[in-house]
């Protein structure tokens, strides 16, 4: 399910680009905070597949901290990327990420971690793709409770 969600994020980013921007050489970034983790390796794998299927190049960059995140956006812009998907190392970087992206006229989709503004409030205007982990946990708890009650 989560692999599918990540592929949808990449597809969504491609879809929000203008038709004239969608070309054989279109580039989109995929920035992740922990590239050594199998979870993110899988995300990159499916982003590459979406890129191959839809005709865009995925530029994968590790962004373990704020400085590397902002530098990565500069690098993406220099390479001609039209936008990026990001799992930020720190949600409080949201305003800086968005300011830098706007400066380059790049589209952004946040993944997993919702950006927060200076007051710590969610930045609801930034597209977000994530799992409903809380709801999944609640459902698991309910099912475990039922199993436990059945054995009492």
Go through each PLM region and give its residues.
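A short acidic, amphipathic alpha-helical/loop segment
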Residues: 72, 96-100
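Anion (oxyanion) recognition and catalysis
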Residues: 52, 102-103
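Bacterial N-terminal signal peptides that target proteins for export
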Residues: 1-9
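Sec/Tat signal peptide C-region and signal peptidase I cleavage site
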Residues: 16-23
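Extracytoplasmic "Venus flytrap"
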Residues: 27-54, 58-71, 75, 79-81, ...
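Cleavable N-terminal signal peptides
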Residues: 10-11, 21
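Hydrophobic alpha-helical segments within soluble ligand-binding/sensing domains
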Residues: 69, 128-151
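Short beta-strand elements of ligand-binding domains
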Residues: 85-88, 104-120
